[in-house]
Amino acid sequence: LINGIELNESEEDLKERLQVSKDCRDLNEYLEKFEFPLTLLQKAEAITECVRMLIAGQDSQGIMYSEIRFAPQLHMQKGLTQEEVVKAAIKGLDNSDYHKLILCCMRGSDNEELNKETIRLAHKYLGRGVVALDLAGAEKLYPTKQFVGIFKEALAYNIPFTIHAGEADGEESIRTAIYMGAERIGHGIRAAWSEDMIKELA
């Protein structure tokens, strides 16, 4: 029983629910695997414990520094507010100097206000466990250019941000992310298809 949810699956069944197959077709199919673990992370206590367990695992592997990224808006299914989610995750950091949080805005068609709230929370908790923002999700369905406007607010707040770009979409997505002010690019594998883009990123 985890977070009020009974898990009767075998280890192999759990792996099937959490891992994509070798013939995974695209990013959207990959992202579907987030749905199950998210059901277990809808209470503050579960979020705090998850962060602590993740950090303990990293420490045991000798990882010196990490930035744990997650989307607060995806943890509201049982009544938590985004701020309660962020506070729970910060609590799990236990004031660590070596493990921090990146708050993700999500690509979508009806969540602009949620994304704006994420940006405001990143501003509020910047330097208090939060170090940056991100934009994640289904890049092909919701192109990077659709989010230029809301990230102007992040720039106004001087919040550093990274953007997942150039994974499911082409190099133009990376170019847009750079134009938006991204300091880092998540994945960005399509850059390898363009010598000009490689030079621009160098």
Where are these regions (language model features)?
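Active-site metal-binding loops of divalent metal-dependent hydrolases
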Residues: A165
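Metal-cofactor-binding active-site regions of metalloenzymes
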Residues: L1-I159, A168-S173, Y179, E183-R184, ...
